[in-house]
Amino acid sequence: MKIYKDYSLLPYNTFGMDVKAARFVEYDSVEELTGFLAGHEDVFPCLHVGGGSNLLFTADYAGTVLHSAIKGREIVGETEDWVDIRVGAGEVWDDFVAYAVACGWYGAENLSLIPGEVGASAVQNIGAYGVEAKDLIRFVDTVCLETGCRRRFANEECCYSYRESVFKKELKGKYIVTHVTFRLGKRPAFRLDYGNIQAELGGAEPTLEGVRQAVIRIRRAKLPDPKLLGNGGSFFMNPVVPAEQFEALAQRFPDMPCYPVAGGRVKIPAGWLIDRCGWKGKSIGRAAVYERQALVLVNLGGASGKEILQLAQAVAHSVKDKFGVTIAPEVNII
């Protein structure tokens, strides 16, 4: 276990905010985590970070920041059709996807190149190109911050919805994810009807590696490398509206794209809404809307978290004024 005071969080947020944590704790086992919680009464306020790809710090953090270095992958169940694999929360997400593809297991390939760590996938319900983490997750193993007790959540207990989970709502800040068990398929099953994966494949017969590489090419063409240009990926969630509201909008904006979702509702791409408001490539101070993808806000260099937030609020206000639609941040603002 590593414990530091006044520790820079620059390596733990992809926006490139050089803020500090009053205390930073990194653990590499459940036992180390529970031991720390049992031995320290001053844990709170507390924040758990992974790769920091979904965080925007607007100031130094006055409490304890925890980071998991729990690694490992273990097959815990298997049949001719599927495999259950339990993965440490500190594993890099895309490393896990690459491993699954190399093993010939289906399900995670559309989630290639999403930044962050495995633990965050279960909290954020990450998703891309028609696939969400909830489609693969069977169990989420956790530790309660208040009691140090372990608890396993089955998929249905996680209350997953679009970019949401019980860990972001009712139980926010109460449990730390230590391991996630995924069920992946052994028989060919691709999801190619979302985005332009089919076009990127160019008519070739889909393979696991082929789909993975197609997704990687698409993402790299759209999204900036945070090592070169600080960003948190998609800053806003795609809004979901009632069908009646979408139909009214479609009368005014016939070219508005949409995706039907459960419950007779419609998902609208937030990037399209932002682009139509004229924000692509625009900036406030050193914070800007990425010129290739309006859904992404970037740090041009030296931007503060407050500048990024100011830009985000201005963008959301414009979308609300023009379309009457509220776009909410996908990024966790601290």
Predicted features along the sequence, with ranges:
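Phosphate/pyrophosphate-binding loops and the adjoining catalytic core of nucleotide-dependent enzymes
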Residues: 315
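Phosphate/pyrophosphate- and phosphate-bearing ligand-binding catalytic cores of soluble enzymes
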Residues: 4-5, 10-14, 55, 150-306, ...
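Beta-rich strand-turn-strand
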Residues: 105, 305-308
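Anion-binding (especially nucleotide phosphate/pyrophosphate-binding) glycine-rich loop
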Residues: 1-147
